[in-house]
Amino acid sequence: MKRGLFSFFIFLTLHVPLGSYAQAVKGVLTYAGEERLALDGEWAFYWKQLLEPGYEAFTANPPTYVKQVSYWNAHQELKEQLPAFGYATYRLVVKSTQDYRVAMEIPGFNLSYALFLNGELISGDGVVSDSKGTYVPDWTVSMKTVMLHEGENEIVVQVANFDHSNGGFFKPIIIGDPDILPHERDLNLIIET
């Protein structure tokens, strides 16, 4: 039995890619066809603002850059500690070296979110709102297949939380090969159970 477990872990080590360690800098990250890339690093962050996708909305509002992945009430680089309850917009520009069809693994956000890629809503949970009365919480992990176009691709995530002790997201969005990433996720779920 021990030998079988040892062989299984050796197999995982050799066959499950760990992914790239590229990090976003000042809200920009490059994707060059990696099998797995966590969208870690500095994201543009707009506290108490639910901004719509598009260049104009973001040029009129100077960002604060926060290291992802961390709840917004745990960001060390902010001048003041934010409360867990509130709402915000995150933005990341992914520069793609060519057109790529990719899988996008989207973690659960605390506690409602809307995720846009190049202006199109591709995923969401609950109802994002700037008030507790109209916000609806939900929490689901999802996997989508999307197109990254050569050049700049804008990811905008609107998040609201009026229920949980932590706000924002604590696991990275991951992009990668659509033939590999979903199977890697399934394998991780099997291991966790």
Language-model-detected regions and their locations in the chain:
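Extended carbohydrate-recognition surfaces in non-catalytic/accessory domains of CAZymes
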Residues: 21-98, 186
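Solvent-exposed beta-strand/loop surfaces of large extracellular or lumenal domains
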Residues: 62, 120-141
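Short solvent-exposed loop/turn micro-motifs enriched in small/polar/acidic residues
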Residues: 85-87, 106-108, 137-141
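Aromatic-lined ligand-binding clefts that engage carbohydrates, nucleic acids, or primary amines
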Residues: 93-118, 155-159
